[in-house]
Amino acid sequence: MKRKPSTEATAAWIRLMRVQSRVLDCVEQDLKKAGFPPLAWYDALLELSRAPSGEMRPVELERQMLIPQYSTSRLIDRLVDEGLAARRECKIDKRGQFVEITETGRELQKKMWGAYSAAIEKHVGSKLSDADAIKLCGLLDRLGCSCGEAPTLAARDGAPAR
């Protein structure tokens, strides 16, 4: 017999979904006010910049992105149109493509981090002590989130961690 979630578990789920949506909306608004493109652009540029060669196959990029991106090909088209990324044909598999970050893309990603990090502090960091943030990461880890990577990635990249 399958067990139904408790009232408390259901309430936690609802809060988690609402808070995630609201915080993302606030971060998006802060980026827009600062004159930057959407967070998905930053996310894609960050992942491309983290790739050892600065390039990835589109499917790899989609898997790595922090924000679910259901129209990765359209996002890549926009990044290419703006000169932030370029497409490159795969020499081994002529049907395959790579997307690589351009120097302009690297510059934008670094500039966006200033506004993005301020938004993270405003909407998350200022509301949680470091001890609370560690506890929250532990709880999210139990749900399958990878918050355990945060210190390593943040220290390495000076960029938002997962």
Tell where the protein language model's regions lie, with residue ranges.
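Short, hydrophobic-biased segments on the C-terminal half of alpha helices
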Residues: P58, I76-D77
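N-terminal helix-turn-helix DNA-binding core of bacterial DNA-binding proteins
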Residues: C26-P68, T152-D157
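Charged, amphipathic alpha-helical coiled-coil/dimerization segments
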Residues: D77-K135
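N-terminal positioning helix adjacent to the helix-turn-helix/winged-helix DNA-binding module
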Residues: E8, A12, A40-W41, T104, ...
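C-terminal regulatory/oligomerization modules of transcriptional regulators
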Residues: M1-P5, D130-R162
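Alpha-helical linker/hinge and terminal dimerization helices associated
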Residues: V23, V27-D30, M65, L108-K127, ...
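N-terminal leader segment of winged-helix/HTH proteins
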Residues: M1-A34, R162
